[in-house]
Every structure is written in structure tokens, then in C-alpha cells.
Amino acid sequence: MKIWKKTLAAVLAGMLCIISMPQVQPLLPVFSAAAAEETGTVGALTYTLKSDRAIITQCDKNAEEVEIPSEIAGKPVLQIAERAFLSHEKLTRVVIPDTVRTIENLAFSHCSQLQKVTLPKYLVTIGSNCFSYCAQLEELDVPKTVKNIGHSAFYGTAWLKQKQAENPLVQVNHILIDANACTDTTIVVPDGVTEIGGYAFSVLVQLREVVLPDSVTKIGSGAFWQCLKLEKIQIPDGVTTIESRAFYVCEALQELEIPAGVTQLPERVFSCCANLEKLTIRGTLTEIGEAAFSDCPKLAEIYTTMSEADWNAIPVGAENEPLEQATIHYNSILEELLLADLDNSGSVDSTDVFYILLGVAQNAVGMDSGWTPAQEKAADIDGSGAVDSTDVFYVLLYIARNSAGIPTTWEDIV
């Protein structure tokens, strides 16, 4: 009898434990919600229904002209999925309803006969390679609501060729999406551009200098990929985002300054910059991605406003050995100096001449000038990117004229 009572008590206790376990109860609704997702077809189109939207996922390969509905089963069509129309070689015309906000990567890529696309009035995002290699695509009007354009979205289209013929710096809604038709060694990006699009300058092998306006806030993935001769570029202070591979294989780049707003250096952002020697980081980094500095054998000096403890706390991805070899200058003062005022005294005098002459002489015999990045910038009077005898001459002339009572500005001299 005692054994029977103990057995019954154990069974009842086990059942009570199972019934009272809160994590068992939600499993069924989660499973049911996943199963509730619907797919179906309407005309030549295949769709998926979510709780708040319909997504176009595929199209019949034999379709020639397609008009996508604005609503399916009472839900608005908000999205065209990745690869939905990829390589539809018979497709010639598409009308996309105004409900659509996003067209994903490769959605219409390699539609070789596609000639006209009517984009929605309130479109926000055009994915990477969205219309790439649609060789006959000529009629396309990108609405002003578009804020995100993935890399190579229009590569290989007749539309892009027309735009390049009008201006080799192709802009859409203040995004510079393509500069591949440029042949100049120096390119000045016009004011008002807010983003350098992904791969916009890629493989411009003749490019030596890029001047970016203060309006730029983002440099897209692969923006300067394989610009082998790029030597000079100043990243504007307003930039907050530099995406992966932005400066990948910029072999001639020797130094670069990262503005304070940038907090992450993503994967391979400076990979294979074989001659990169000096890096100035004005802000506080929260992450350095995998291989961000791989194959940068000459990286020797890094100036940062961060403390040693904060620097060592940064999560660093694999393949960043050059960071371990470089000398890190912690808590570096990176204040802006007046032109030629290397001692930050507020005036230009013989002391500044001494510092400039000493630095030029040390550089001439292969030694480091000993200047901070701010001092080097202040010593480059003519803005040539190098401090030399010309800059020394300008400083001496500036001091001599002002000492003689002849009011002289740098604009009068340079």
C-alpha cells in the first residue's frame, strides 16, 4: 500500500510540474503563426502574405508585360523580393504600384529585354544590382522619395549610359551613384552630395585625388575599390558611416584621417592599402571589423583621441595584425591649428619657421618630421599634400611682409 501511494504521488507531482511550466504553453502559438503564412499566385505573379503586407516573390518566365497589383487578399503590396524577376529574358515592361516601398537586391537583374519600368511614387529603397545588366532599360524615373540605393543598382543599363553622357558624376537624390565614366586624375565632387554610393569610383585606375564636399555623410561599400593610384582624399567631418571595402586595394594611399562621427571600421575597409603608413582617428571606435587592415604592411603610426584602456577594449576582428605592429599614440591632441602656427601660440613667428625647417630637413634625410597630423596640416601652406621648400618660402614671405608693416594674408601669398 505504501509503495502504491508513493508511486501515485510521484506521478501526480510530475503532472503538476508539466502543467505549471510556463515555457511549454507558448510553443503551439509560435508554431501556428509560422504555419499561417500564405503563398499563392495572381496572374503571372507568385506572392507571400505576411501579417501586414504582400510580397511579390516570383514571376512566370514567359511574361512579357507585367502590372503588379497594389493589393492582394486585402493586404498592400509593399515589397518586391530579392531575385523575383531575375533573368526574365522575355520581360519588356513592368508597372509597379505606388504601394511598394522596397525593391530588393537583384530583383530585375539580367532582364535583357526590359525597356521600361514605372517606379512607385513613394519608393524608399532600391537594392544592390536591382536593375543591373538590363541593357535595354532606358525609361526610368526615380522618385524623390528614394533614400537608399544599393551598389551597382543600374549598372549596365542604357539609362545609366545616358546619364553618364550628360554628366560623368551621376547623381540620384543627392547620392553619387556612379563616377566610372570619369577620366580625370582629380575629381571634385559637387556640393550637395550626401552619399558616395557603393562602388561609385571603383577601378578608376587613373584617379589620384578626390575632393569631397562637407555635405557628404556616408561612404558606401567599395566606393573607392581598387583605385590603385589614389593618393589624396580628405574625409569630411560630417561623415558618420564608412562601409566595408570602401578603400579596398587603394595601394597609393599613405595616410588618412577618420572623422569623429565614425564609430565603426567594417570588414576590409582598408584591406590591401599596401602603402598606408599613418592613420588619424578623431572619434571613439566601438568596433574594428575582420581584416579591416589586412595586408597593410607599412602601417606604422596611429593617432587617436582614445585612451589606451578604451583602445584596448575595442572588439577587433581577425586578420588585423598590422594594428599590433603600429605605434598607437593615445590621447593625441588633434586640435585645428592656424596655418603655419605649429606651436599653437596664436601667431606665426620665427619659432614656427624653425619647426617647419626642422621637419622638412628631417624628411629630406628619410627621418620622421616629428609633427602631429595637425601640425603637418598647418605646415602645408599651399595645400599640396606635402610640406617642402615652397611652404617654407611662403611662411618667410608672410612673416617678412607683416613685420614690415604690410598687412598680408595667406590669400595674398598663395
Which residues does each predicted region cover?
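Gram-positive cell-envelope targeting signals
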Residues: 1-36, 342, 356, 395
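A structural signal for leucine-rich repeat
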Residues: 294, 315-319
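Structural signature of tandem-repeat unit edges
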Residues: 44-52, 61-78, 89-102, 110-125, ...
